[in-house]
Every structure is written in C-alpha cells, then in structure tokens.
C-alpha cells in the first residue's frame, strides 16, 4: 500500500510539473485542423519572454495583428512579448516571430506558418490570412500554462478555407445579451477562424436595435411582461424582461468585429416574426391589434400588413437606418415563417394583390406572391444603396427576389434548389447546424433545449455541396451554425 501511495504521489508531481515546469510543447492539432501540417526533425523554436513579434513598418493592420498575438500569448502564458516595426528591406532579429504578406499565396484568407529553431515566419496573402495563422499558433499553445518556455515544433503549416463564408448566428431577439457578452461571442468566432457574425436583432419576443424614426420599437417592442417557462407550457415567470442596443453600441460591435476580420450581418426579420414591432405600432398589422410583445415561442398569424403602404414605408425607413449602422455587403431580411392567414382576409392586402396583378398558380398562392412582392421591393431599395439581401429559404415559395442569396435552414433541399436556380446559397440546415438542439437522445439529463438532436459527429459530417454539380456548387458561399436562443444563460451559450 505504501509503495502504491508513493507511485500515486510521484505521478501527481509529474502531472503538476508538466503545467508549471520549465517548458511545454505546442500542439498543432487544433480546430479547425489546418490543410497541411509538415513537421521536420529540426530543433524547436523557443518562445519566451525575450521573443519579439515583428511586422512591416507602416502596415497598421499587421501591427494590430502583432498586438493581438502578444495579447493572446500573455493571456495563456503570462509572458510579455514586445512588438517591433521592420523598416523596408530589414530583417527581423533571430528569435523573432515575423508577420508579413506574400501575394504568391493562392487564397486571400490563406497563410503559411514556418517554424525554425531560430525564427518563425507567418505570411498571408492578406492581413486576414495572417490573423487566421495567429489563431492556429495561439490554439497550439496550452490555454493556461506556467511554463517559462514554449517549444514550437519545427515545420510548416499551410492552410486556407474551403469556403469564403464561415458564419455563426446569435439570436438576441428571444433573449437579450449585453454588449460585453456579444464581444466575447465574437472572440470565440475569431478563435475558430469564422469571418461572419449574423446578428438576429428582431423577433416576436423583442426588438433589439434602436431605430430613431420609430422610438416605440425600443420603448415598447424591446420589453415583454412575462416569459413562458420551458417549451410552451402554461406557466410564465411574470417578470418584465428585455433590453436593446443603441445605434452607437451596434457600431461599436461592428468595429470590434471588424478588427478581428469578422463582418457583422444584421437581420431584421420580415414580414413575419414582427409581433414586437406590431405591439409598438399596431396600425401596421392587418387587424390593428391590440398586440403584445410575445411571451411564448412559435409561429404566429399576425404579421406585417403588406397592403398597408405605411407598413412598407416603415420597412424602408428601418432599412435606411440599418445600412447607416452596418456597412456589410449583405443585409438579412428574414422571410421565414410568415403565415398568409391574415393576408387572405385583409382588404388592404387583397387590394395590393389586385393592384400588383399577383396571380396564383399550381405551386403558389396569390399571398405567396404578396410576400415575394414585399421581399423584392426591399431588395430593390437595398440594391440601390449598394447592398444585397439574404433571406431564409421560404423566399423560394414565391418568385425569388432576383439577386437574393438564400440561407437554407429547413434541411439542405432549399439550398440545393436555389443553387440549381443560379442563386448564391449559405447552408445552415437545422439537422446539422442548429447548436441550440439537444446533443444527446437522453434529454432528461440535458439542459432544456427547444428540440432536435444534433450530436457533434453529425455537425462534422455536413457536406454543403452534396447533390450538386461542379457548376452549381460554385453558388455555395459557405456554411453557418445557428443559435436560436430559447435560453437566457450566457454560460450555457458559450459552452
């Protein structure tokens, strides 16, 4: 027994020394795994307090990248690395990590990381690529270590993304998250080489972005009097809940994300999922209300009245302010889960159908065409301002707006159809990409989720271009995971 005790103590000491000893070794098996990792037999590079991070003089983006790398290393190791600008034609000193640009690298987001005993060089075609290489280097180092020296194995890493669009979605409509949490969320996207943050800002359960021309959207629409407990039980918490972002806060997020090479795409979901807006401005609904900011989850019959010109003017006014806040090429305008029930009985909507000569056919109702009218009108407005729309795959149920990019969430079928029609597509199939679903079939022992079953293995198995020809596959811009937040705890979302 005494011998066993001594062996256990010795093992414990060995494990302890591995985290607080003189040195530790980096591991290049990171997520996402680089395209090519080739190790050599040379001695490793010794990263320590004396290491300098060098970058080309007058390149402010690479300077910021160097500062990010120094900050990341400091966070995990406690080492304080200095950054240094290199004059044209000069070489970095031995023992330095040098950041640079190389136009010969084939992909604008690609990078090459070369590690030798006396130096590390990290080149990208653009500053974006260098930043992604920094993330690989960062992840190779233990997240927390007290080692005085980090050994980077000698070799070369080459990497580039398969898709130009790599997104993550955050729903702040159902539950609101403060600005500091949104920044942490963006940091997690950066860590995993994501380049797009889809910010879902409006919902039946809350309007989260300040629109100065319509102040009631946040005075009334950002707050609900109660929230259902669980998955649409008859129990409510009877607690007032809400919040919103000012335009200045939204611009702050755009800047924060941009510094990390992440584009923020805002979503204003229309013409459905608008109960929060209707609670603030009931005259924009088909019945005139009264409406309330919705305390439950689901799909609801009350949507914007497309026959009412005030509703269309409202959308155009909102978009005018949205494009002033968000400089992104794309604006997401929803288009999902908009029941036609109210439109079928609404005199104004029926009048619009007649005026615009919207006809039913064997595949579409006149009300389907009415939704297409709405989406196309907003698309024309945004196109005139140099922007393009993204819509959920329901926009395929009428005449697709001519230049629309389709986000396929109800499986992959909508994305396949859109690509076959020549539309650009972002694949977000719920059966692979909904991160708010259960990850175990034993739901009794998992935290509450709205439904579904998406284990990690299935996420990894997604092939976004399956069932498409080579030409059609060119329309698949990339993929995106979604978090439709029926939970309010930030810690669970981060997990």
Language model segments and positions:
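Feature activates predominantly on carbohydrate-active enzymes
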Residues: 104-313, 317-330, 377, 381, ...
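Acidic, contiguous N-terminal accessory segments
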Residues: 20-166, 383-396, 400, 485
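Substrate-binding cleft/loops of secretory-pathway carbohydrate-active enzymes
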Residues: 274, 341-342, 390-423, 433-445
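Bacterial N-terminal signal peptides
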Residues: 9-16
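Active-site neighborhood of glycoside hydrolase catalytic domains
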Residues: 295, 301-402, 411
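Aromatic-lined glycan-binding groove of carbohydrate-active enzymes
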Residues: 413-482
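Single conserved hydrophobic/aromatic residue that forms the stacking wall/gate
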Residues: 485-495
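Bacterial N-terminal signal peptides that target proteins for export
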Residues: 1-8
């Amino acid at each position: 027994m005494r011998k066993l005790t001594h062996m256990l103590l010795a093992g414990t000491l060995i494990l302890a020394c591995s985290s607080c000893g003189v040195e530790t070794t980096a591991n290049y098996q990171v997520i996402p795994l680089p395209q090519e990792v080739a190790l050599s037999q040379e001695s490793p590079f010794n990263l320590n307090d004396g290491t300098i991070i060098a970058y080309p003089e007058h390149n402010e983006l690479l300077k910021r990248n160097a500062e990010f790398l120094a900050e990341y290393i400091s966070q995990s190791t406690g080492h304080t690395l200095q950054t240094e600008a290199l004059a044209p034609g000069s070489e970095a000193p031995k023992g330095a990590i040098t950041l640079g640009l190389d136009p010969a690298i084939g992909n604008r987001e690609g990078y090459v990381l070369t590690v030798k005993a006396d130096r590390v060089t990290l080149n990208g075609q653009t500053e974006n690529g260098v930043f992604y290489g920094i993330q690989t280097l960062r992840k190779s180092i233990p997240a927390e270590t007290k080692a005085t020296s980090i050994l980077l194995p000698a070799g070369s890493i080459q990497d580039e993304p398969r898709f130009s669009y790599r997104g993550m979605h955050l729903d702040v409509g159902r539950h609101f998250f403060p600005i500091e949490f949104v920044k942490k969320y963006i940091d997690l996207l950066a860590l995993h080489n994501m380049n797009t943050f889809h910010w879902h800002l409006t919902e039946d359960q809350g309007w989260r972005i300040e629109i100065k021309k319509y102040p009631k959207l946040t005075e009334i629409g950002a707050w609900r009097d109660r929230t259902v407990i669980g998955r649409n039980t008859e129990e409510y918490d009877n607690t007032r809940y809400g919040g919103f972002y000012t335009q200045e806060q939204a611009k702050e997020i755009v800047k924060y994300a941009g510094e990390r090479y992440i584009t923020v795409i805002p979503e204003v979901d229309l013409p459905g999922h608008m109960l929060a807006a209707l609670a603030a401005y009931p005259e924009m609904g088909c019945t005139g209300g009264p409406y309330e900011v919705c305390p439950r989850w689901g799909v609801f019959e009350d949507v914007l009245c497309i026959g009412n010109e005030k509703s269309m003017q409202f959308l155009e006014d909102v978009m005018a302010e949205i494009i002033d806040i968000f400089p992104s090429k794309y604006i997401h305008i929803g288009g999902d889960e908009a029941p036609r029930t109210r439109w079928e009985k609404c005199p104004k909507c029926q009048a619009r159908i007649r005026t615009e000569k919207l006809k039913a056919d064997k595949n579409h109702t006149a009300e389907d065409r009415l939704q297409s009218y709405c989406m196309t009108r907003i698309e024309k407005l945004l196109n005139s301002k140099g922007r393009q729309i993204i819509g959920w795959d329901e926009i395929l149920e009428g005449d697709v707006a001519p230049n629309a990019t389709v986000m396929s969430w109800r499986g992959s079928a909508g994305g396949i159809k859109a690509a076959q029609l020549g539309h650009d597509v972002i694949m977000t199939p719920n059966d692979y990409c909904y991160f708010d679903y259960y990850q175990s079939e034993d739901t009794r022992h998992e935290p509450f989720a709205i439904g579904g079953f998406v284990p990690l293995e299935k996420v990894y198995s997604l092939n976004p271009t399956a069932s498409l020809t080579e030409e059609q596959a060119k329309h698949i811009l990339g993929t995106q995971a979604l978090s439709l937040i029926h939970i309010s705890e930030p810690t669970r979302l981060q997990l």
